[in-house]
UniProtKB/Swiss-Prot annotation:
Pfam family, one: RRM_1
Keyword Chloroplast found: no
Other comment: Plants overexpressing RBG2 confer freezing tolerance.
Protein name: Glycine-rich RNA-binding protein 2, mitochondrial
SMART domains, A to Z: RRM
Domain RRM: 35-113
Subunit (UniProt): Binds to small phloem-mobile single-stranded RNAs (ss-sRNA, e.g. small interfering RNA (siRNA) and microRNA (miRNA)) in the phloeme exudate, including viral-derived sRNA (vsiRNA). Interacts with ORRM2, RBG3/ORRM3 and RBG5/ORRM4.
UniProt source species: Arabidopsis thaliana (Mouse-ear cress)
Cellular compartment(s): Mitochondrion; Secreted
Length: 158
């Protein structure tokens, strides 16, 4: 769905600006969207270089990035690999999804665009204050952490 929204936005933007559709810029945007992969389930020891090495034999890896926590510098257990062409990305998905990398079975999927609008639930509020609410990160009925879908083990609650 994100792909269709992006494509529609590109078409509207390019057609409305001058009436012509610059095919090369549209294809370039589509190529970038279809070559970026989400890699989940990474071990804490996987870094950018080892992620790149694991996917390099499928084709030219433009970028490989393990996402780390800003405060601790520790891996968050997922990352992204961007290939130069779609064929390499497709081969990497079919061959690497579910395979073991550094002792963990990884998930490999096409990367989705980051949502531009904030999520409908979560953050700020909830019955006991402190953020959260039904899907968020703190607060909730019992105070502490949690809420219906939140994180933490705030204790209390029901």
């Amino acid at each position: 769905m994100a792909f269709c929204n992006k494509l529609g936005g590109l078409l509207r933007q390019n057609i409305s600006s001058n009436g012509n559709v610059p095919v090369t810029s549209m294809l370039g945007s589509l190529r970038l969207m279809s070559t970026k992969l989400f890699i989940g389930g990474l071990s804490w020891g996987t870094d950018d270089a080892s992620l790149r090495d694991a996917f390099a034999h499928f084709g030219d890896v433009v970028d490989a990035k393990v996402i780390v926590d800003r405060e601790t510098g520790r891996s968050r257990g997922f990352g992204f690999v961007n290939f130069n062409d779609e064929g390499a990305a497709t081969a990497a998905i079919s061959e690497m999804d579910g395979k073991e990398l550094n002792g963990r079975h990884i998930r490999v999927n096409p990367a989705n665009d980051r949502p531009s609008a904030p999520r409908a639930y979560g953050g700020g509020g909830g019955y006991s204050g402190g953020g959260g609410g039904y899907g968020g990160g703190g607060g909730g009925y019992g105070g502490g952490g949690g809420g219906y879908g939140g994180g933490g083990d705030g204790g209390g609650g029901f």
